[in-house]
Amino acid sequence: MALPKANRLKSRHDFQAVFREGLRRNSSHFTLRALKPSSAKKSSLDTAAKTQPADDVQDIPSTLIGVSISTKVSKRAVVRNRIKRQITAAMQQLLPRLAPGWKLVVIVKPTAAESKCGSQQFLQELEQLLAQTEVLHGHS
């Protein structure tokens, strides 16, 4: 199942910003790049919230998620698309627990295609990476 449009990281500019300034965490199958919401936007939101207290919930940006999978992972597009679908399904399950305003890019390593692991293992690895970067609510 695809991510909601409001949660998709699409623009090249956003991807470059995450790669340039974001945090990096690694696991056996993925690298997670995460860019925190900027504090300048938070302070401007706080001043706007003081003048308009009823609309402060709508001002919080949603978390944007992108998946990067190169042909080094697999030459076959069918395999790459299957892995990408599994990752987006796992991220959709984790979406309600993610802190708002983050920009996340999941980079798939070639080991993901070599090992025949399922979406359940992908979900566990992504949850662990998100907890390490402190993106999950109630991270451990």
Curated annotation (Swiss-Prot):
GO terms for molecular function: 3'-tRNA processing endoribonuclease activity; ribonuclease P activity; tRNA binding. The keyword RNA-binding applies. Residues 33-54 are annotated as: Disordered. Pfam families: Ribonuclease_P. GO terms for cellular component: ribonuclease P complex. It is an enzyme of class 3 (hydrolase). Its EC number is 3.1.26.5. It catalyses: Endonucleolytic cleavage of RNA, removing 5'-extranucleotides from tRNA precursor. Keywords: Endonuclease, Hydrolase, Nuclease, RNA-binding, tRNA processing. One of its GO terms (biological process) is tRNA 5'-leader removal. Transmembrane segments: none annotated. Belongs to the RnpA family. Consists of a catalytic RNA component (M1 or rnpB) and a protein subunit. RNaseP catalyzes the removal of the 5'-leader sequence from pre-tRNA to produce the mature 5'-terminus. It can also cleave other RNA substrates such as 4.5S RNA. The protein component plays an auxiliary but essential role in vivo by binding to the 5'-leader sequence and broadening the substrate specificity of the ribozyme. This is Ribonuclease P protein component. It comes from Trichormus variabilis (strain ATCC 29413 / PCC 7937). The gene is rnpA.
